[in-house]
A protein has these predicted regions:
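A short SAM/SAH-binding and catalytic strip from SAM-dependent methyltransferases
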Residues: 100-113
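Helix-to-beta-strand junctions that scaffold the AdoMet/dcAdoMet cofactor pocket
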Residues: 110-111, 124-126
């Protein structure tokens, strides 16, 4: 599987940055904590965390080499004390190392949330908190429904043989159960709509190409990929409002017992 275009993601991920900053406001910090940013991506939110813990420390983890390289470049002068680690969040190389774990738009790219939550609670110190947000429930149902129907058409279907969906949008109840099974207490999980409208067809097309449908794009030759994107963009133009992605955000929080 090809890696992210981290530079483009860094430039166009304003929705993820805005959501992440609001989630960060729900994480109580005094300024001395050691914080783990799970799925740090290109480093925008990692830098925001570092600003809130001037006497603490921040470690960002991601399984994308390209994202970590972009994050290193972004953080070099902004948060030089931040450490970056290449790791899968379902098997973090930490034990009782952090006062808090934060994550933005990451968990929906992983299919084993039970393993994920076990890994995170192991990385937390007793009393440490998890505050996170990811796609959940009916997230992007309109876009992925349209894309799925196109993928089944004869002109595209041969490129998607043995296709495995890379996303997993958990619901509230299953997330509560998995957090509890991992050992978390004070669990709080909720789902909220976050429809996101783009200025026009170019902005919409670029976003879905580089974020939502990145994996589909790796399967298609360039001419077919351009056709695929064009047809989805034409469909989005007929929506009300046009060029809107039907995002849903799953908010989750929990604490490792003291």
């Amino acid at each position: 599987m090809t890696d992210w275009n981290a530079a483009r993601y860094h430039e166009i991920s304003a929705p993820q940055q805005a959501w992440g900053r609001r989630v960060l406001e729900r994480l109580p910090l005094t300024g001395t904590e050691r914080v783990l940013d799970v799925g740090c991506g290109s480093g925008h939110l990692t830098a925001a965390i570092a600003e809130r813990v001037p006497a603490g420390g921040v470690v960002g983890v991601d399984r994308s080499v390209a994202m970590l390289a972009q994050a290193a470049d972004w953080l070099r002068t902004r948060s030089p004390r931040t450490h970056l680690v290449l790791a899968d969040a379902r098997a973090l190389p930490f034990r009782r190392a952090f006062d808090a774990v934060f994550s933005g738009a990451t968990f929906h790219w992983m299919d084993d949330h039970a393993a994920l939550f076990r890994s995170i609670i192991t990385a937390l110190r007793p009393g440490g908190r998890l505050v996170a947000q990811c796609g959940g429930g009916p997230n992007l149902a309109t876009l992925y429904g349209r894309a799925g129907r196109l993928m089944q058409e004869p002109r595209f279907a041969r490129y998607f043989e043995e296709w495995t969906d890379p996303t997993y949008f958990a619901d509230v109840d299953s997330t509560k159960r998995r957090l509890a099974a991992a050992g978390f207490v004070d669990i709080d999980v909720s789902l909220e709509p976050a429809p996101t409208t783009f200025d026009g067809p170019e902005q919409y097309r670029e976003f879905i190409a580089n974020v939502c449908l990145r994996h589909q794009g790796t399967r298609l030759p360039r001419p077919e990929w351009q056709t695929f994107l064009r047809e989805l963009t034409v469909a989005a133009a007929r929506d009300d409002p046009p060029f809107t992605l039907d995002y849903w955000r799953l908010n989750l929080a929990g604490r490792r017992p003291a």
